[in-house]
């Protein structure tokens, strides 16, 4: 439990973070963590500040430490997965995103990112299997249809792939007389 003074500092740091004054927020969060080194909200928000400043290694360390203290924090799991994804570290992102989906399986955005990581790593069979399952849960998801369609093209299943790409992007096949783009 934190005292009133620390709570006041935390709110000050949050104000800096929201106003994109990340260096100031970092200073305050670090001061809080000197007194309360195992305070997940301070670690998590410090990681967000580092991420915004493109200090990826520092952000990663904060998220990992946060998860060591509170392993069930789905927000920290998702943000660590997002950090890896946004920095092109798809192999590192996959197990983190998988952990997130085990914690809560109906996260549509996490499912999209997981599918894209599989796609970027050219894991065609895994993309195929994963997207089939995901599209049963989210049949209108255009991003999943796009990854699945592109993956089907990679697998030389061109007709099926084109069908999913048409559904997801509104592409028009040559030779169609009537077409509609939503």
Show the residue positions of the predicted features.
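Canonical positions in the second alpha-helix
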Residues: 31-32, 65-66, 99-100, 133-134, ...
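Structural marker of alpha-solenoid helical repeat scaffolds
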Residues: 35, 69, 103, 137-138, ...
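Alpha-helical segment of the N-proximal tetratricopeptide repeat
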Residues: 5-35, 41, 48-52
């Amino acid at each position: 439990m934190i005292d009133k003074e620390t709570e006041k500092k935390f709110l000050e740091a949050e104000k800096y973070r929201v106003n994109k004054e990340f260096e100031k927020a970092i200073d305050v969060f670090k001061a809080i963590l000197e007194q309360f080194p195992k305070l997940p909200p301070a670690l998590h928000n410090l990681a967000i500040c580092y991420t915004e400043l493109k200090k990826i290694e520092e952000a990663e360390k904060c998220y990992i430490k946060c998860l060591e203290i509170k392993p069930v924090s789905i927000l920290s799991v998702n943000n660590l997965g997002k950090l890896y994804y946004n920095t092109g570290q798809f192999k590192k992102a996959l197990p983190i995103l998988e952990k997130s989906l085990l914690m809560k399986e109906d996260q549509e955005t996490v499912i999209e990112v997981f599918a894209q990581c599989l796609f970027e790593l050219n894991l065609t069979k895994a993309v195929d299997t994963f997207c089939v399952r995901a599209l049963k849960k989210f049949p209108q998801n255009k991003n999943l249809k796009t990854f699945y369609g592109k993956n089907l093209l990679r697998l030389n299943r061109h007709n099926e792939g084109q069908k999913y790409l048409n559904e997801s992007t509104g592409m028009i096949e040559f030779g169609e007389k009537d077409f509609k783009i939503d």
